[in-house]
């Protein structure tokens, strides 16, 4: 039998470095019919079972595990393998032809395969009547790729893959491997050096950390029951609809006996709470698989796999489905800017800078010690866009909040002179990222109508929410970081000094209509030594709670969608700790319960009155009444809806001094109802107010023929609307 084996081939197979196993293994034409070769390290014997049941014993080769024998020129066969522990009969992986179509490979190469995980990754399929899993991975510079797993003792010699040369995709159909199998890819770089075993970049399921293997996902699709939600989603998420977002970290919203809830447990507890509180959406901090829990998900590696920390992918689908059935939208934080350097991940995936830039001046982020995606490479931008579509289409997610957009837009982001590479025109803008974001948002709008894309963008980059056709980036909304920074700084000042910083309260209206905004009080504002939202407020306990209530009243009546991080809705006094659950016991304290009740009522007020949301992006929806009373730290403004909607008057006193008969001009006479007062006793306030209503007097003020003499409670926000 020695003439059947070339010594160089034997050595390459034995050392797991043969780059074209299909040229050697499997059945190939011979003078006597077909010569079948197999390499099954650890096997004692191998036979070929022909279609008629005849068994052809294969002869052992020059290396343990090598077997060869002559078969008839035609007909199928199966392998009967004798292992030390028993016998196995299976199809030969090397009996099957190429798996992926040329069209699939073309789309992958062009970065246009929107269902990328249906082509790459691990897909349970049936080929020529045989069930198994097709593995496929993009690694164009690898000299050899093998799939290893619990089905082959993690032995890279067992299942070397086929290279589809023009695309750089390696593929192999492995019979009898099904859902639940753990696997990785074992690659050699372009010069033959062995690389760390890699998790599948396109895996739909991952092993629970600290494990790093990928898992063959169950192909059974989730049976959705959210048709009603999906049919009305576009209207529910339109620009003139209310959007109040409750941002959560799934692992620390509620911990019972120190244990994370799974998706079903979270749905049982979170969904009724969110519905009762009146939020329209939940926003999940990243749920893509990530190796380090302390990154809160913002350094993901499994961009197609919901993290195993909270259960299976179908568990995540059930969570979204249940949210939709209760009328709650689901937004997911998504990270296309950078990825961690973990050896099992994307870093130097095939021995080259494949997903990242090769030059650290473009490819390494020193702030986070992460690698930066090369958005200018078609396959990489296509990989990221397909990840977005995976969550939007497969999991019915209603929107993505795109993380760290500013870090992507500017080549000199957080870099000193000489530490970055200018664009082709010598500037700082990252043209490749701009093109990527525009295409991402165009694809989302075309293929998932009604879904929303939200940018966390902290600079004045123009046109973030302008349409791509008009030169914009195409996002639906942008976080208003300027409003957040200015107003939080103002709210943190002792009231005696606020008169000198009045502009921080009013400046946001100068640019309020330059973009479509979300007002974010996010997790970033309650970590890294910043303290809690309540902890930022000055004064004694009474003043701190009153300040918080007034600030929330200002937030919920200011133009822009709302986002509030978990714990802020009841005045958590300490910074958020991702290793612990929220301090729910504080709701036994009437002060914290009062803040929670206030947020619940603000959400209902915000949804109930179209004037508070219908014209968030239209200057006609807002008018200052009092914007210049810095001495008293008072602001007053009108919110207006569409024709026929009642106007809403908002007045906020940011000092602890009660203002008596503070006169505010209003556009119409008659009685005005006080529909909200942050100083109400039910919220923990002193119960000072206007007795439920005020009658306008014929005394001109602020450009109006009539006015209201109001009592402004200390550190209080009141909202009034005319009767009828």
Curated annotation (Swiss-Prot):
GO terms for cellular component: cytosol. GO terms for biological process: glycogen biosynthetic process. The keyword Transmembrane does not apply. Keywords: Carbohydrate metabolism, Glycogen biosynthesis, Glycogen metabolism, Glycosyltransferase, Transferase. One of its GO terms (molecular function) is 1,4-alpha-glucan branching enzyme activity. InterPro entries: A-amylase/branching_C, Branching_enzy, GlgB, GlgB_N, GlgB_N_E_set_prok, Glyco_hydro_13_cat_dom, Glyco_hydro_13_N, Glyco_hydro_b. The active site is at 403 (nucleophile), 456 (proton donor). Monomer. NCBIfam families: branching_enzym, PRK05402.1, PRK12313.1. PANTHER family: 1,4-ALPHA-GLUCAN-BRANCHING ENZYME. This is 1,4-alpha-glucan branching enzyme GlgB 1. The lineage of its organism: Bacteria, Pseudomonadati, Pseudomonadota, Gammaproteobacteria, Lysobacterales.
């Amino acid at each position: 039998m020695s003439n059947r084996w070339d010594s160089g081939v034997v050595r390459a197979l034995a050392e797991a470095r043969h780059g074209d196993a299909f040229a050697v293994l499997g059945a190939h034409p011979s003078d006597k019919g077909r010569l079948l070769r197999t390499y099954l390290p650890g096997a004692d014997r191998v036979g070929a079972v022909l279609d008629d049941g005849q068994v052809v014993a294969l002869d052992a080769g020059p290396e343990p595990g090598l077997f060869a024998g002559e078969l008839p020129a035609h007909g199928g066969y199966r392998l009967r393998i004798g292992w030390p522990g028993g016998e196995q009969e299976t199809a030969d992986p090397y009996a099957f032809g190429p798996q992926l179509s040329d069209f699939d490979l073309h789309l992958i190469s062009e970065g246009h395969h929107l269902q990328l995980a249906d082509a790459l990754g691990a897909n349970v399929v049936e080929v020529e009547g045989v069930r198994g899993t097709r593995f496929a991975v993009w690694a164009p510079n690898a000299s050899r790729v093998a799939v290893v797993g619990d089905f082959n003792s993690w032995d890279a010699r067992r299942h070397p893959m086929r290279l589809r040369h023009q695309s750089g995709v390696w593929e192999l159909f492995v019979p009898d491997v099904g859902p639940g199998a753990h696997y990785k890819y074992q690659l050699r770089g372009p010069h033959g050096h062995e690389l760390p075993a890699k998790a599948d970049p396109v895996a739909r399921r991952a092993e629970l950390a600290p494990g790093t293997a990928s898992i063959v996902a169950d192909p059974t699709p989730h049976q959705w029951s959210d048709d009603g939600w999906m049919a009305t989603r576009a209207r529910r998420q339109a620009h003139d609809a209310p959007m109040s977002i409750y941002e959560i970290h799934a692992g620390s919203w509620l911990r019972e006996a120190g244990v994370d809830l799974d998706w079903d447990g979270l749905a049982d507890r979170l969904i009724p709470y969110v519905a009762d509180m009146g939020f329209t959406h939940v926003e999940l901090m990243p749920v893509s698989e990530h190796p380090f829990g302390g990154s809160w998900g913002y350094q993901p590696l499994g961009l197609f796999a919901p993290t195993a920390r909270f259960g299976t992918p179908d568990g995540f689908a059930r969570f979204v489905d249940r949210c939709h059935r209760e009328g709650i939208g689901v937004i997911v934080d998504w990270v296309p800017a950078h990825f961690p350097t973990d050896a099992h991940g994307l870093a130097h995936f095939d021995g080259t800078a494949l997903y990242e830039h090769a030059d650290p001046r473009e490819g390494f982020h020193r702030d986070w010690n992460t690698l930066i995606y090369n958005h200018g490479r078609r396959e990489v931008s296509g990989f990221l866009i397909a990840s977005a579509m995976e969550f939007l289409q497969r999991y019915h997610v209603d929107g993505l909040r795109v993380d760290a957009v500013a870090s992507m837009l500017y080549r000199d982001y957080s870099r000193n002179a000489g530490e970055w590479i200018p664009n082709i025109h010598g500037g700082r803008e990252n043209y490749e990222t701009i093109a990527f974001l525009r295409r991402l948002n165009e694809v989302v709008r075309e293929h998932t109508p009604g879904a929303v894309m939200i940018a966390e963008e902290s600079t004045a980059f123009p046109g973030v929410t302008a349409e791509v056709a008009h030169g914009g980036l195409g996002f639906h909304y942008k976080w208003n970081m300027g409003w957040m920074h200015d107003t939080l700084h103002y709210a943190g000042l002792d009231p005696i000094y606020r008169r000198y910083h009045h502009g921080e309260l009013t400046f946001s209206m100068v640019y309020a209509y330059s973009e479509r905004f979300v007002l974010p009080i996010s997790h970033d504002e309650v970590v890294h030594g910043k303290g809690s939202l309540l902890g930022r407020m000055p004064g004694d306990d009474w003043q701190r709670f009153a300040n918080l209530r007034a600030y929330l009243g200002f937030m919920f009546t200011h133009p822009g969608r709302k986002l509030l991080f978990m714990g802020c809705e009841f005045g958590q006094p300490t910074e958020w700790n991702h290793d612990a659950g929220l301090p729910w016991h504080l709701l036994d304290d009437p002060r914290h319960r009062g803040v929670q009740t206030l947020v619940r009522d603000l959400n209902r007020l915000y949804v109930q009155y179209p004037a508070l949301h219908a014209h968030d992006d239209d200057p006609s929806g807002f008018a200052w009444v009092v914007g210049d009373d810095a001495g008293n730290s008072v602001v007053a403004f009108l919110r207006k809806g569409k024709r026929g909607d009642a106007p809403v008057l908002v007045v906020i006193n940011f000092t602890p001094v009660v203002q008596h008969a503070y006169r505010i001009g209003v556009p119409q006479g008659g009685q005005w109802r006080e529909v909200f007062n942050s100083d109400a006793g039910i919220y923990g306030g002193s119960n000072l107010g206007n007795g439920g209503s005020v009658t306008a007097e014929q005394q001109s003020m602020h450009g109006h023929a009539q006015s209201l003499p109001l009592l402004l409670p200390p550190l209080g926000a009141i909202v009034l609307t005319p009767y009828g």
